[in-house]
């Protein structure tokens, strides 16, 4: 069976869907099922005609939108993708009837459009183009309150492993044997001790060559969409004694740019030199080769193209600019590295300790409930680097570096500045906290941002989200944004998206984290906006309200009139989890009390109609 007959495709914004798809791909490889593994956007659309078995894992982002790598390739092409092709109206209703398929959606039921992206893809492929499902679509919920794990208390991984089990059982039932040369043999799993070499990997051009690149300038090639900005302001706007450092971060674009309120900036950060040195110390066999020129055996891996590939291509530069070893490892990381726990020379207890480490890494890779992995990695927020420091028996071949470590992905930040202004302003909360291990943790990108100085350069892209529709610019806007959720709303009020804007902002203290408070009060005094701040830990300045939903309820009759009678736009931004759920519940009660809706069902239906009309906008993270 050729690799074009089976495809494992993913649509992933944060990496979860991609990781589960990678685990499935790994399992299929070990069973000798040749297949294509790719994002939906980077899958060659002509291959869909040869494909017979298609497995899709997809998450949902934003307002029930498709992840970007469903409709845009790593090089920024949106015209020649599979999804663009499948949306063509002229395609016949039986266009995909040659394909057997299965779908897994990863979602969070606290969002209004739970697993909406996968449902869009499923509807088009199955209901409209005739693909045949092997089994019913599966949907996993982070909250365990909806989808395939509703009420079970089990996480999304339980749904994934059931999805995987059904696919492998299906394929093994139909293809129990395989052809090797002229012989038909039983299909059996490859020895778990054997590492599966990736299609393309690194090659040391000449390890004995005296040429090396150390400390010289770097450039990036292969991504024409990347832009460069110059830092003009990096100012803390919370009090020094406040627990959170929030920055007013501004950079001037070197190019003419266009963006609207609700659009985001993708920033390309990199690891510190100190963390790179720590990684090299974990793998001392790499040190003599760290600055030697490298090349690829079979072309540049697709995932490196976003942002461009660093030049000169050396191990040190790859670790600094491309390898996200400061991230929390996913189970696919352990699947690939456990077999390389072979170095007994650094074990105090010798071979016995090495075997213990090897066994523990294998358990992290294969444990289906993932509880041990969660306790070891996720709860203490342990990084890949720290895993490598804990398990010194790991001795990784340099050649497969990019198969072991995930790529550093750009981080997305909502724009705060006025539309199309060449001075792009962001409102960034610096991630820094202590874990249960009492260790300080920092975010790779926000730590990078916190250290930038005026005059430094930064690499970025603008991502246009089209959250605010032009036809609604005359409608009233009701905007809710606790904390740094203010960022896109600040862009909206500065850009005057509507002649009638109400802004509900929440923070802890008026004198500590009242972000852009004076500017917003000045706008309110000038009659440009109605501004309703609330301070959850400051009873002196907020005596009768605590959270933004309390202020919404206080002015509930007015807000309901704006949303129902005057077809207003509701724009909610901030942290995902409890906040958006509480806001939505408050709106439902307001609609029943002041909007003329007699029960939950009719109020919920009105909110759904607002979503369909793009009048209910939720941007949470």
UniProtKB/Swiss-Prot annotation:
GO terms for biological process: cellular response to oxidative stress; iron-sulfur cluster assembly; nitric oxide biosynthetic process; positive regulation of nitric oxide biosynthetic process. This is NADPH-dependent diflavin oxidoreductase 1. Its cofactor is FAD; FMN. NADP(+) binds at residues 536-537, 545-549. The keyword Membrane does not apply. Interacts with DRE2; as part of the cytosolic iron-sulfur (Fe-S) protein assembly (CIA) machinery. GO terms for molecular function: flavin adenine dinucleotide binding; FMN binding; NADP binding; NADPH-hemoprotein reductase activity. FAD binds at residues 381, 411-414, 443-446, 621. InterPro entries: CysJ-like_FAD-binding, FAD-bd_FR_type, Flavdoxin-like, Flavodoxin/NO_synth, Flavoprot_Pyr_Nucl_cyt_Rdtase, Flavoprotein-like_sf, FNR_nucleotide-bd, NADPH_Cyt_P450_Rdtase_alpha. Keywords: Cytoplasm, FAD, Flavoprotein, FMN, Mitochondrion, NADP, Oxidoreductase. GO terms for cellular component: cytosolic [4Fe-4S] assembly targeting complex; mitochondrion. NADPH-dependent reductase which is a central component of the cytosolic iron-sulfur (Fe-S) protein assembly (CIA) machinery. Transfers electrons from NADPH via its FAD and FMN prosthetic groups to the [2Fe-2S] cluster of DRE2, another key component of the CIA machinery. In turn, this reduced cluster provides electrons for assembly of cytosolic iron-sulfur cluster proteins. Positively controls H(2)O(2)-induced cell death. It holds the Pfam family FAD_binding_1. FMN binds at residues 12-17, 59-62, 106-115, 142. The keyword Signal does not apply. It is found in: Cytoplasm; Mitochondrion. Residues 224-489 form the FAD-binding FR-type domain. It catalyses: 2 oxidized [2Fe-2S]-[protein] + NADPH = 2 reduced [2Fe-2S]-[protein] + NADP(+) + H(+). Residues 6-168 form the Flavodoxin-like domain. Its EC number is 1.18.1.-. The gene is TAH18. Belongs to the NADPH-dependent diflavin oxidoreductase NDOR1 family. In the N-terminal section; belongs to the flavodoxin family. It comes from Candida glabrata (strain ATCC 2001 / BCRC 20586 / JCM 3761 / NBRC 0622 / NRRL Y-65 / CBS 138).
């Amino acid at each position: 069976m050729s690799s074009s007959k089976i495809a494992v495709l993913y649509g992933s914004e944060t990496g979860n869907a991609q990781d589960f798809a990678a685990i499935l791909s790994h399992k299929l490889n070990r069973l000798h099922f040749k297949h294509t593994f790719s994002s939906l956007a980077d899958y060659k659309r002509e291959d869909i005609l040869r494909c017979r078995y298609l497995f899709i894992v997809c998450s949902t982002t934003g307002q029930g939108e498709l992840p970007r790598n469903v409709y845009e390739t790593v090089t920024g092409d949106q015209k020649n993708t599979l999804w663009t092709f499948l949306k063509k109206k002229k395609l016949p209703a039986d266009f995909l009837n040659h394909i057997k398929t299965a779908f897994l959606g990863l979602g969070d039921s606290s969002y209004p459009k739970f697993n909406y992206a996968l449902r869009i893809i499923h509807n088009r492929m199955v209901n409209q183009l005739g693909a045949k499902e092997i089994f019913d679509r599966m949907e996993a919920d982070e909250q365990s309150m909806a989808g395939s794990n509703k009420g079970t208390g089990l996480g999304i991984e339980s749904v994934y492993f059931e999805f995987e089990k059904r696919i492998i059982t299906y394929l093994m039932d139909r293809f129990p044997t395989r052809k090797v040369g002229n012989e038909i043999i039983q299909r059996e799993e490859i020895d778990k001790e054997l590492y599966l070499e990736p299609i393309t990997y690194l090659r040391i051009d000449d390890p004995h060559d005296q040429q090396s690149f150390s400390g010289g300038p770097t450039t990036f090639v292969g991504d024409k969409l990347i832009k460069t900005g110059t830092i003009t302001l990096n100012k803390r706007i919370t009090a020094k004694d406040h627990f959170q450092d929030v920055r007013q971060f501004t950079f001037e674009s070197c190019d003419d740019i266009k963006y609207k309120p609700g659009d985001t900036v993708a920033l390309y950060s990199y690891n510190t030199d100190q963390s790179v040195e720590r990684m090299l110390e974990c793998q001392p066999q790499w040190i003599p080769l760290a600055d030697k020129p490298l090349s690829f055996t079979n072309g540049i891996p697709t995932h490196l193209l976003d942002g461009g590939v660093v030049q000169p291509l050396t191990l040190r530069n790859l670790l600094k600019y491309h390898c996200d070893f400061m991230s929390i490892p996913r189970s696919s990381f352990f699947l690939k590295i456990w077999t390389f726990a072979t170095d007994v020379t650094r074990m105090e207890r010798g071979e016995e300790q090495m075997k213990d480490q090897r066994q523990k890494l294998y358990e992290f890779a294969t444990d289906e409930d993932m509880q041990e992995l969660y306790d070891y990695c996720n709860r203490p927020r342990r990084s890949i680097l720290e895993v490598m420091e804990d398990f010194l028996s790991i001795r990784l071949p340099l050649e497969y570096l990019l198969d072991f470590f995930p790529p550093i992905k750009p981080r997305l930040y909502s724009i705060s500045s006025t539309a199309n202004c060449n001075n792009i302003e962001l409102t960034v909360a610096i991630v820094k906290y202590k874990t249960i291990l009492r260790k300080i943790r920092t975010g790779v990108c926000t730590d990078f941002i916190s250290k930038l100085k005026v005059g430094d350069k930064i690499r970025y892209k603008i991502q246009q989200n089209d959250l605010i529709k032009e036809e609604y610019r005359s409608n009233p806007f009701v905007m809710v944004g606790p904390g740094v959720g203010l960022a896109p709303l600040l862009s909206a009020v500065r850009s005057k998206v509507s002649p009638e804007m109400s802004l509900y902002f929440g923070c802890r203290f008026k004198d500590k984290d009242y972000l852009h408070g004076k500017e917003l009060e000045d706008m309110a005094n000038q009659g440009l906006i109605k501004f309703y701040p609330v301070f959850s830990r400051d009873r002196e300045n907020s005596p009768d309200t605590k959270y933004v939903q309390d202020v919404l309820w206080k002015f509930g009759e007015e807000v309901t009139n704006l949303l129902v009678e005057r077809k207003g736009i509701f724009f909610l931004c901030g942290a995902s989890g409890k906040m958006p759920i509480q806001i939505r519940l408050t709106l439902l009660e307001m609609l029943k009390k002041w909007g003329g809706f007699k029960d939950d069902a009719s109020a919920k239906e009105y909110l759904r109609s607002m979503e369909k009309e793009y009048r209910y906008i939720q941007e949470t993270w």
